[in-house]
Amino acid sequence: MHIETAANVLRWLRGVVWSGKYKDAVQKAMQDLIATQRGDRGWADIGTTPSTAFATGRALVALQTAGLLVSDEVYQKGVKYLLSTQQEDGSWFVRSRSMTFQPYFDSGFPHGFDQWISAVGTSWATLALSLAAPAHTPTAANGQ
């Protein structure tokens, strides 16, 4: 089975990995997704579009869900892409590909017309980075 986009892989993996079935197919899907990582270390949703934080974050989450270690070179390249494309305000800019279907209003999230997809892209990027963060055990404020 060949799955062309990170979006399709993640949708497929959500059910299949958690079911514990089809391990060979999961490995094949992982390899297919890894093969679509670009020279800039990111992923794109559609082959002809630029890499984005949205697609890269989603691809990394899919790969980690499928069993790729966050220490793997592929994952770390994706992390570097995300860190290199993060905006000064902490968000990631993702250009919308959709037609305008509702009146524009400013939510307060940066990037104007592209704020909604950028908010989702920022969420995926943040999730992917959090998976790669070192484990941290919180301590009580009083030190106990």
For every predicted segment, state its role.
Residues 140-144:
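Eukaryotic intrinsically disordered, low-complexity regulatory tails and linkers enriched
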Residues 1-31, 35-138:
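An alpha-helical repeat/solenoid feature that recognizes helix-turn-helix modules
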